[in-house]
Amino acid sequence: MFKINYCFRYRFLYLLGFLFAFSSNLFAQIYNGFQSINHNQIDRRFYLYVPNNYSANNPIPILFNFHGGGGDPVTYMNYTSDMRGLAEENNFILVYPEATTDPSTGSISWIDKATNGAPRDETNFIDAIINLISRDYSVDSDRIYACGYSEGGIFSYELACRLNNKIAGIASVSGSMLSESERSNLGFSSCSPQHPTAIMLIPGTDDTNAHSLYQGCCLGWNLDSYYLSANEITEYWTNFNSTDNIPSVSDVTNTNTLDGSTIQRKIWLNGDGGVEVQELKVIGGAHDWPGTSGNMDIDANNEIWQFLSKFDKNGMINNLNIEDFHKSVLVTPNPFNNFFKVKGVENDLIELYDLFGRKIECKINDDIFNTENLKRGVYFLIIKEKNISFKLVKS
């Protein structure tokens, strides 16, 4: 008869308990399709897409994508904004929630139009989805993003305001932001972000929808809410994020001359934690999703992910404050024209990136970078071994 090793038994039971506690995460079955959740005694749905290379050992981001008013996730995904390919390429969880009926209008919507009574709690519906997915999958809780089209874009701003403890950044296409002062009659508190928040907006100057007019709408029109202009939106978020007052402005190459529109890119840099506010102003653009309808010079899907993925709830990922730059390293001239030189670096890998995180060139040791063919704009130089970076400007 053998004796039990109690130390071994304790370790075994501890390990068994640990695995049981986390089994729903470690052994979650990847399921792509509609899932249900009961929220406020109402059965709600969302379309979930988990990339094939998901691993429970590697926490990954979540991107919510919200359909417009009167829409549904499947039609929206198939005909307006299909980001499943991006989710596969960049390894993030993609979620298309489904809105419910506004009791005051009978239409499918994210924003309650009622002027009295308690508004629907759609913000907590999204919070409940985040909690459910985080229970079943390994999620990077600092990298949860939201985007949407039309009313879905408006709702993305609402999440940036009212679920900011969970949301790192948002992007809105053809959807304005509600004025917090005018929202008071719906029972909401003022917009109250808690951390530097990355914001992208893609508005059309010729959009005729009342809730997404470039110049704002409709104070004095006897409507329930006031929708901010594009300039008011960027002013609010650049002030909150403490970015540069003057944006970097450039014209996007007009690759499609038949779509009747062009794009101007405006980027407000150097916000708290390195966050940015970016506007892709579609000049001549209507109530569209660029790359699918209307303007074809950009793909809004790619623009949104390239922008949001640079940030987490702490700001720009791997951002360094200028006070931490190594004083022995000198980059000159800056601003530069046809070249710049890096001094004070030995046997270090030096990488040059553009404003959108694309690697332009890499070198080792002190060296001269020939920049004759680079476009004017902002670039970032990263010295790997010293873990420092410089912002450079080509004039």
Segments (PLM) and residue ranges:
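C-terminal outer-membrane/trafficking sorting elements
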Residues: 323-395
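Bacterial Sec-dependent N-terminal signal peptides
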Residues: 1-30, 319-320, 380-381
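The conserved beta1-alpha1 loop
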Residues: 64-68, 174, 203-204, 283
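The feature captures the conserved acid-bearing segment of alpha/beta-hydrolase catalytic domains
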Residues: 168-169, 174-248, 254-261, 267-273
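Acidic beta-to-alpha connecting loop that harbors the catalytic carboxylate
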Residues: 99, 205-208, 284-286
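Serine-hydrolase catalytic machinery in alpha/beta-hydrolase-like enzymes
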Residues: 37-53, 57-145, 149, 158, ...
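Alpha/beta-hydrolase-fold serine-hydrolase catalytic core, especially in secreted/extracellular enzymes
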Residues: 197, 238-322
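A domain-start/cap signature at the N-terminus of enzymes
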Residues: 26-62, 75, 89, 118, ...
